[in-house]
Amino acid sequence: TTVAATKLTSLKATAGKLGYREICQVRQWAPLKSAMPHFGMLRCATSTVVKAQAQAQATATEQTTEEAVPKVESPVVVVTGASRGIGKAIALSLGKAGCKVLVNYARSAKEAEEVSKQIEEYGGEAITFGGDVSKEADVDSMMKTAVDKWGTIDVVVNNAGITRDTLLIRMKKSQWDEVIDLNLTGVFLCTQAATKIMMKKRKGRIINIASVVGLIGNIGQANYAAAKAGVIGFSKTAAREGASRNINVNVVCPGFIASDMTAKLGEDMEKKILGTIPLGRYGQPEYVAGLVEFLALSPASSYITGHTFSIHGGFAI
């Protein structure tokens, strides 16, 4: 018997003598351990409560974080002359990267639609716009189309261009004007229109496609060389003026890039051209597109502006 039981028996006997029947009817005390919860059960219950509280807190934290972090919108990009060649490669590269792309073209509507379709197959968004970038009304309409569709413009790649090659002494003024209007004035008009939009949100990137010919000249391309050299000088000024509004302007100068035109060159001509390139081969449109993507989207390029990048395999070292 326990000490508690002995005391209870003694108490009952004493109470009986004194006539306190109620006390005699008191039930036997239960052992102390049966009156207390098992520590193992207590631990389990406590653990369950703690886990539930932690889970609830984690869920609340996740919800708060989701609400606090703003949704990142896909950059809106306008690429001129994007239906083929370098422009096509740039549009596809930016589309793959998640951009919303306006694919500009002048005459190649079918090809532009194919580019747009490919971007959508990658999971991106794209629209096409037929317009002449040397005409102010077309440029304004193009920019408005992008803004109406997606709300803003983040990046512009001025790639549209033509050639009208002939020796200087034989060049007609119309050939000069046509190349200057599209290759230089077109860059001016698109950059001006885009800058007005970008200034409002104090952010934007403009990449102008020039040429190695604008750096070193080339026989039979006085008009083209003048236009591309003009693009380089123009871009440096635009970079200085846009810097206070966080608008970066840079230039890419391709050399000999594989195209439908190079594919039609004879073996002898190709051998001569490749002999002038230290790397001994043509560049690919995707090489240019990769550089443009870096300048357009990478945080690492945010401190680069007013710079001219050559991508020519060493041709103009």
Swiss-Prot record:
EC number(s) given by UniProt: 1.1.1.100
First and last residues of the transit peptide: 1-57
This protein's GO CC annotations: chloroplast
The keyword Cell membrane appears for this protein: no
Substrates-to-products reaction catalysed: a (3R)-hydroxyacyl-[ACP] + NADP(+) = a 3-oxoacyl-[ACP] + NADPH + H(+)
Keyword field contains Chloroplast: yes
UniProt binding sites for NADP(+): 79-103
Signal peptide: none
Compartments it resides in: Plastid, Chloroplast; Plastid
Swiss-Prot/TrEMBL keywords: Chloroplast, Fatty acid biosynthesis, Fatty acid metabolism, Lipid biosynthesis, Lipid metabolism, NADP, Oxidoreductase, Plastid, Transit peptide
Gene Ontology BP term (one): fatty acid biosynthetic process
The protein's annotated pathway: Lipid metabolism; fatty acid biosynthesis
Family annotation (PROSITE patterns): ADH_SHORT
Superkingdom per UniProt: Eukaryota
Active site per the UniProt annotation: 224
Single GO MF annotation: NAD binding
EC class of the enzyme, as a word: oxidoreductase
Subunit text: Homotetramer.
Sequence similarity: Belongs to the short-chain dehydrogenases/reductases (SDR) family.
Protein name per the record: 3-oxoacyl-[acyl-carrier-protein] reductase 5, chloroplastic
Organism per entry: Brassica napus (Rape)
Upper classification of the organism: Eukaryota, Viridiplantae, Streptophyta, Embryophyta, Tracheophyta
